[in-house]
Curated annotation (Swiss-Prot):
The modification Phosphoserine is found at residue 66. Belongs to the eukaryotic ribosomal protein eL22 family. This is Large ribosomal subunit protein eL22. The gene is RPL22. InterPro entries: Ribosomal_eL22 (IPR002671), Ribosomal_eL22_sf (IPR038526). The modification Phosphothreonine is found at residue 62.
Length: 128
């Protein structure tokens, strides 16, 4: 049998990867149908780190609010999709799911937009 070579990684430690995602709540906050402080509190209670909610990994995940934008910064693996899932859960809990949707407007951010219902209704009336 041939000898088995073991690969040894050269170098030191891995660089910590910092993930930063933003949630833009400008339109619903300006219209006063949503409270950004309440949504920030919801995210703090629901985000799980290492399988535990309300944990936030001892500072590994931070949630900051500036005006109508919520920024989630993470040093541990955190997916953008998980932020969308929690945002949709918040909308459902507060009965806003029928009026708002979560849309990705860049690679690292989501935006809450209204459904375009008025245009659809006008088109249906024109067809009748």
């Amino acid at each position: 049998m041939a000898p088995v070579k073991k690969l040894v990684a050269k170098g030191g430690k891995k660089k910590k990867q910092v993930l930063k995602f933003t949630l833009d709540c400008t339109h619903p906050v300006e219209d006063r149908i949503m409270d950004e402080a309440n949504s920030e509190q919801f995210l703090q209670e629901r985000i799980k780190v290492n399988g535990k909610a309300r944990n936030l990994g001892g500072g590994a995940v931070t949630i900051e609010r500036s005006k109508s934008k919520i920024t989630v910064t993470s040093e541990v693996p955190f997916s953008k999709r998980y932020l969308k899932y929690l945002t949709k859960k918040y909308l459902k809990k507060n009965n806003l799911h029928d009026w708002l949707r979560v849309v990705a407007n860049s690679k690292e951010s989501y935006e809450l937009r209204y459904f375009q219902i008025n245009q659809d209704e006008e088109e249906e009336e024109d067809e009748d």
